[in-house]
Amino acid sequence: MEKKLIIFIDSGDTIIDESTEIRDEHGIVIHAETIDGAENMLTTLYNEGYLIAMVADGEEQSFTNVYKENGLGHCFKTRTISEIVGEQKPSKKMFDDAMRKNNLTEEDKKRIVMVGNNVKKDILGANQYGITSILIDWSPRYNMNPETKEQVPDYIIHKPEELLPLIEKLNASLE
């Protein structure tokens, strides 16, 4: 059954554990592992019929390598990547690109969540764009304390498996 909720999701330290990245001499990620529970979370959301769009900062080839290696590339309907867009989150252009690629309209914004690990990029960008923000705060690599009201997430989860019941709850509220 097609779900009403639409999921925009970051990659690094949201699905992929950045501490496991191995880069080549050009800085392209050639290997990385998923966060514990992230593979199951992503495949479950995909199998349940959610539209999942990657919205991430980085190099396109890095994402291709990592998701091919982990066998998860098929879970994303589209990928919006900063290298291609020419700007990083929280830029509106990143979210505009994801909307365009998925044929979404202004009216669809109330059905979109952005899941990410960075209050200054993912959460700020989502909040400024007018979509629901979900912070996954498991990683110690970034400061998770909002410095402005616009960096305060709508929801906070601590590990990938906590996303599933939250997504189901938010989707049910749209039914």
Where are the regions a protein language model picked out?
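Conserved phosphoryl-transfer catalytic core
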Residues: 24-28
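Asp-based, Mg2+/Mn2+-dependent phosphohydrolase catalytic module
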Residues: 1-20, 31-46, 50-175
